[in-house]
Amino acid sequence: FDFWNEYRYVVPKGYTRFLGKLSELTDRGIEVHFFIGNHDIWTYGYLEQECGLIVHRKPITTELYGKVFFLAHGDGLGDPDNKFKLLRKIFHNPTCQRLFNAIHPRWGMALGLNWAKHSRMKREAGKELPYLGEDKEYLVQFTKSYIKAHNDIDYFLYGHRHIELDLMLSHKTRMLILGDWIWQFTYAVF
């Protein structure tokens, strides 16, 4: 979602067909996991109750086909930007969330969508910064630090940065950032 905020009685416009397809999958018994990120913090049960999604607010570690995966959106993991950390605390604060939800959906959704658009457009040509290299890419730095205490993980899989990255961090450990769903529609297959 570019911006998702659940109001008690309002479903955000523009996502009906997508939500319907997700519901179709879960109705057929297919698990759909959704990792909360910086554009969709404000989900309060609709995606679980109405669409059958399994919503994750934090990273998870799981075993699939004999391999150990660390799965996360990537939001808030290792980002050194103090302004971003402050904004993230405000966005995750339950009181601030209740106050925002008191705003009429017409204005609240417009504000959120415009904020997301502005955030994207302030980057060059509206696209994510290119890969910064192992020494400067904060998700790589986070992963390298995390591996020191959790060296049993085979794959780290993230979104958030909207860049394609497939990086071997050791003979055993591989890190992937899924890429850009807005321009390139990239994804990973295991």
Regions found by a protein language model. Give the residues of each.
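Conserved beta-sheet core of the metallophosphoesterase superfamily
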Residues: E50-R57, F70, D75, D79-T95, ...
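Short amphipathic alpha-helical patches
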Residues: G45-Q49, A110, N114, K122-G126, ...
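Core catalytic region of metal-dependent phosphoesterases/phosphodiesterases
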Residues: F1-L64
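Hydrophobic positions within alpha-helical membrane elements
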Residues: W4, W42-T43, G78, M109, ...
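N-terminal short leaders/motifs
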Residues: D2-E24, K122-I153
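Active-site-proximal loop/helix segment associated with metal-binding centers of metalloenzymes
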Residues: G74-Y138
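Short C-terminal domain-edge/linker segments immediately following a structured domain
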Residues: E24-G29, L64-K67, L99-R106, Y187-F190
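Active-site beta-strand termini and strand-to-loop segments that position acidic
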Residues: E63-Y65, L169-S170
